[in-house]
Amino acid sequence: MPDSSTQDKIVMIATDGACKGNPGFGGWGALLRYQGHEKAISGSENPTTNNRMELQAVIEALSCLKKPCQIELSTDSKYVMDGLTRWIHGWQKNGWLTAAKKPVKNADLWKQLLALTRQHDIAWKWVKGHAGHPDNERADQLASDAAIALMQQEKA
């Protein structure tokens, strides 16, 4: 466990994506914390997928940072976790093709995310969704609210 002086220098980020229908109305949300300051961000898109919104949440959160940072980033998305920690370098090496030689889905977002992750020192943390993790619950609410707001706006 890092001591409090080390912990104060870490940007804590929680991200989540949501989709009402898949594909359908999507939203993303992120919560950033640093030295007692907190920033909540969200956005939406239609049509989209839950996986695109999960990726967009991480991209938008990292894009908020103005200089290289030490980050602890939590997500409930196995897709994001496995993509970044297990698959992305193989995809890149294979010209953005999967092991089955099929084009990587969401390669546009994976490429953006890869470029952003290279600017920071990131500790990736998977958390179980809808299991009472306060920051994940907040990110989930931001994402869900953004998707619902877009759905209501487009149906009005």
Curated annotation (Swiss-Prot):
GO cellular component: cytoplasm
CDD domains the record matches: RNase_HI_prokaryote_like
Reaction catalysis annotation: Endonucleolytic cleavage to 5'-phosphomonoester
UniProt GO BP: DNA replication, removal of RNA primer
Cellular localisation: Cytoplasm
Top enzyme class: hydrolase
Domain RNase H type-1: 7-148
Plastid recorded as keyword: no
Record GO terms (molecular function): magnesium ion binding; nucleic acid binding; RNA-DNA hybrid ribonuclease activity
Required cofactor(s): Mg(2+)
Name of the protein: Ribonuclease H
Biological source species: Zymomonas mobilis subsp. mobilis (strain ATCC 31821 / ZM4 / CP4)
Gene that produces this protein: rnhA
